[in-house]
């Protein structure tokens, strides 16, 4: 079923994104496609294998490569400034080890919009499929979290994590004219972000980017406001929120395969449970 009036909105969350990847498996199994997708960070990474219609590809990455030091390690951070091995993730894996179906991805019947944060100007920069290119540099930028990944220089911009300004990128879908949303979150109901990063630490690491200091300081408030906005839409019958229904015991840097695979299984279950609600929302 190809939805026409309902957009898909994806939170990030690092390795908690395996929940979202499970939800996408349910969408693939039910041949559910969306006309418009907005994504940041891990959400942007994991949606790619859904768009290329490659079931269980993300799961196979976890099963075979998540403990590989090329994927995630302190060694990566020492060598490249990134704890995640982005060259391995965006080049070696899709082009050689677990081939990515670029043709199927390009044929996906909808628009993808991925945000990265311009830390010079303090604004979200959006990239569609064409702008992402074959190496997905904007997705890499969107996934580059402060302190554990270097600033990505792309097309004259200095970019970091798209979730800094658009943690739950629902507004982009509303601005595109979509009034109904499916929102995939990677936190339990009731979660609120509480603390920002101390400004003195930001000033010491990111001296050249004062806009980033303010963004990081305001991040908890911004996250909570965006979360409350989509929860309000759900109460009004304008959105379906899919999020973990069991207490999360995993953080964004957890690479224990058994925990990630269990979270993926849970995501599949939550995705299947939401299918009827998604179809009902579309038909309203």
Where are the predicted features?
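Patatin-like phospholipase
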Residues: 1-40, 48-284
């Amino acid at each position: 079923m190809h939805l026409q009036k309902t957009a898909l909105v994806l939170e990030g969350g690092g390795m908690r994104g395996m929940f979202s990847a499970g939800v996408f498996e349910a969408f693939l199994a039910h041949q559910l496609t969306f006309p418009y997708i907005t994504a940041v960070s891990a959400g942007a990474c994991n949606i790619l294998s859904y768009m290329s219609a490659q079931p269980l590809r993300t799961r196979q990455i976890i099963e075979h490569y998540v403990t590989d030091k090329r994927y995630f390690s302190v060694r990566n951070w020492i060598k490249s400034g990134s704890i995640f091995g982005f060259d391995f993730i965006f080049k070696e894996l899709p082009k050689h080890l677990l081939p990515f179906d670029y043709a199927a991805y390009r044929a996906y019947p909808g628009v993808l919009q991925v945000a990265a944060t311009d830390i010079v100007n303090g604004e979200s920069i959006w990239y569609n499929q064409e702008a992402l290119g074959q190496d997905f540099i904007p997705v890499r930028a969107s996934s580059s979290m402060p302190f554990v990944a270097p600033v990505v220089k792309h097309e004259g911009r200095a970019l970091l994590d798209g979730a800094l300004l658009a943690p739950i990128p629902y507004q982009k879908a509303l601005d595109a004219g979509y009034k109904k949303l499916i929102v995939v979150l990677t936190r339990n109901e009731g979660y609120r972000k509480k603390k920002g990063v101390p400004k003195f630490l930001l000033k010491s690491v990111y001296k050249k980017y004062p806009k980033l200091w303010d963004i990081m300081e305001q991040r908890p408030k911004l996250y909570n406001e965006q979360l409350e906005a989509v929860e309000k839409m759900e109460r009004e019958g304008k959105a379906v929120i899919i999020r973990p229904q069991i207490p999360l015991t995993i953080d964004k840097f957890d690479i224990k395969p058994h925990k990630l695979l269990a979270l993926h299984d849970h995501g599949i279950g939550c995705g299947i449970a939401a299918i009827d609600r998604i179809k009902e929302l579309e038909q309203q």
